[in-house]
Amino acid sequence: MPGMPPFDFKANYLKFLNHEETPLIPNEFVGNSILGFGAVNGPSIEKGGADGSPDGFGVSWVCPETGAGAAIPKPGEFLLEDICDWREKVTIPDPASFDWEAEAARELANVDRSQSVICFGFGNGVFERLAALMGFEEALLAIAEEPEEVNALFEAITDYKIKALDYIQKAYQPDVVTYYDDVATERDLFVSPQTFRELIKPHHKRFAQACIERGIIPFYHCCGKAEALVEDMIDCGWNSWTSVQATNDLESLIPKYGKTINFIGGWDSTGRPGTPYATHDEIVAEVKRVMDTYGKFGYGFSFFGFRYPENGDPAVMAQFMGEIVGEAMNYSIGLMMQKLGAAQ
């Protein structure tokens, strides 16, 4: 932007990670490189191969045209009907069997660490993995009827994910690892807060603490209305809650908790701004709403917005993301320049 002095976007993002005030509202795609699962479907050990081969657990994944490129378990082919059979039916992968070094070399080829934080996305937390193995309905029934068996499976999954951390750290040397485990819908949690705290949270906490022990900053990704769990997220040790949707009361959460846990998101991803039909003016208006409403505190918030193409076309997705990120950067830089001018 004309008149803008040299600016270190990575340093700005690091301030955000340290829960400090930032001169510029952070943007998840500027000064931060998202690798692994998140930008794409990530290592095949978690989401299967592009050729349709199953993941390390034996689950086959497909990318429906209406899913914006996101992989889902192949419909009608769940591996597990009875949670009590998980030891016989489910393969817990050995992270040593996957070529993390080759995956990292490919993903890091065009990344400049001097300019960017490295954030590795590690998909399929314990609840999502249970749903991938059984389907959501059977997974929820298993949680209600056989919590001891579910807990035993969650222990095994978490053991694997913590072992994988060492391979990820060696190959990627990430600053951040994001743990993906959607436990909510747009309206509410899939399970009661008590059930979450008894059955799911201990495994989240164990993984987050394993990251911290290795010097890695742990992020927690959860779509949906999960604001009731913010204090649990803090207790687990998550640095940030990412992909926070507008259904949560971010305007209240940031000043209350933003010096302890960061909030990343704010975009109305389930409203018109998240659709392929949004106009440029609607995108600009949503950028301003998010920045003005959540960025005004100067801490505890990073912008993250996206919209879905109709058929998952990567070129269209890149165009959509370029528009959103570009408008967000122009607006946030303008806000920063206004503050600098007012301070002089």
Predicted regions and their residues:
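Short aromatic-enriched loop/helix-cap "lid" or pocket-rim segments at secondary-structure transitions
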Residues: 38-42, 65-69, 73-74, 131-132, ...
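N-terminal accessory/capping or targeting/presequence segment of soluble
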Residues: 18-20, 24-64
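Active-site loop segments of alpha/beta catalytic cores
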Residues: 1-32, 91-344
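A contiguous, low-structure linker/loop signature
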Residues: 51-101, 111-117
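Alpha-helical interaction segments
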Residues: 3-6, 47-51, 76, 151
